[in-house]
């Protein structure tokens, strides 16, 4: 099969990212959310910076031109997203978190329409509808009474807000970064985000005796730093280069499935509404991306919005 190695890499990305929800839930049992995120991205940023130096090198003109954009993106997309991600996982399940994040490709499409004036096709609108129903099912736990009383988990709302930050990171990066490569943009924003997380952690986290932290927690942090944040990113961008962004983005929607399987394997019960929600989210993104085709009655698809 052509590009088999790329598909294997992207499957690895999905597995790494899916595992991250469970690992993050584990680490916040020992570290504060800000400390967990600071350790993860401090390590990842250092590795990414080394990779950048030995591949593309530090280009001062590019750095000066995009300095403000890198700072804003680092604060929104790395600091904002991950601070909310780790805090949210203290109050909701890894499965719910992954399912809510599964809405990201469609949320990005909405923000791209608003900020970049990108057109949205009919299949994208239909896909957004499916995914919205799926996420609504998850955060209301399948209860109509929850909708009536607006008694939605605070953790779910925090994760969703983090999702907005991550979507803004991609859209604003397209809008404001000039002449920056994916590697350089991600490295610089990751450094800004890591520094922000470390500073916040120093002022908000209670002192923890590192000698009392189980080796498994350090292993979880190392996994998230090196596999999810470094390898996952490199493989993701290799996929975009080889098979294109649209096909590559489909692998993000395996993440909730992986998280659900891992949660089930470690003894977490999976509820029917979570399974249905996962199916609807995946169905929505597959519809929006064109993998599931909508019958056409004319030869040219029209923009819906």
Curated annotation (Swiss-Prot):
Q: Which family does it belong to?
A: Belongs to the EamA transporter family.
State the protein's name.
Answer: Uncharacterized transporter YyaM
- Localization of this protein: Cell membrane
Question: GO CC: one term?
Answer: plasma membrane
Underlying gene: yyaM
Sorted alphabetically, the keyword list is: Cell membrane, Membrane, Repeat, Transmembrane, Transmembrane helix, Transport
Q: TM spans, by residue?
A: 4-24, 38-58, 67-87, 95-115, 125-145, 152-172, 183-203, 215-235, 250-270, 272-292
The EamA domain covers 15-140, 164-290
Topology relative to the membrane, per the entry? Multi-pass membrane protein
- One matching Pfam family, short form? EamA
Q: Does the keyword Repeat apply?
A: yes
